[in-house]
Design a protein with these regions (language model features):
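Low-complexity, Ser/Thr/Pro-rich intrinsically disordered linker/stalk segments at domain junctions
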Residues: 2-7, 11, 16-155
């Protein structure tokens, strides 16, 4: 009986770690600049992606959407960074950012970012993901003011 208890206890300790190891690390995106004194009429986006598998070429694409009167999100014309090479995976998360500047509007508009992530190994594309901006992500650089993180921006 003691042997069964020890085995059961060992499995409960070891199995969660095995399950967690199989899950891909999370991506995130945030608004880190929203119409500040230093960056008027600007929307800054920052994102992070896992730096695995090692050796993969990492790319991000930043796009902006606006909230329609019926609550849907539609693309903002010409608010697309195109694919940006952000580095080679070395085992640590990689952050990158992109800013967009807009003409002043007579009525406010709510904006958010959508970031697409791509991992490439040679000609293979083993992983692709997408994330909409959300609050609560401290970025390593570029936030105005420092530490700013939001899901949306009203311009």
């Amino acid at each position: 009986m003691l042997r069964v208890l020890v085995v059961a206890l060992a499995l409960t300790v070891l199995l969660p770690g095995v399950a967690a190891a199989k899950e891909p690390a999370a991506v995130w995106a945030t608004v880190n600049v929203c119409d500040t004194a230093k960056q008027p009429d600007a929307l800054g986006l920052r994102a992070s992606m896992p730096g695995t598998p090692k050796g993969a070429r990492l790319s991000m694409r930043f796009q902006v959407e606006y909230r329609t009167t019926d609550g849907r999100w539609d693309d903002v014309a010409d608010a697309d960074s195109g694919w940006r090479a952000v580095g080679t995976a070395k085992g640590a998360p990689v952050e990158y950012g992109w800013s967009f500047t807009f003409a002043k509007r007579s009525t406010p508009v709510t904006l958010r970012g959508v970031v697409k992530f791509r991992w490439r190994q040679g000609d293979r594309l083993p992983r692709q993901q997408e994330a909409a901006t959300e609050a609560g992500h401290a970025s390593k650089a570029g936030a105005d003011p420092a530490g700013y993180s939001a899901a949306t921006c009203v311009l």
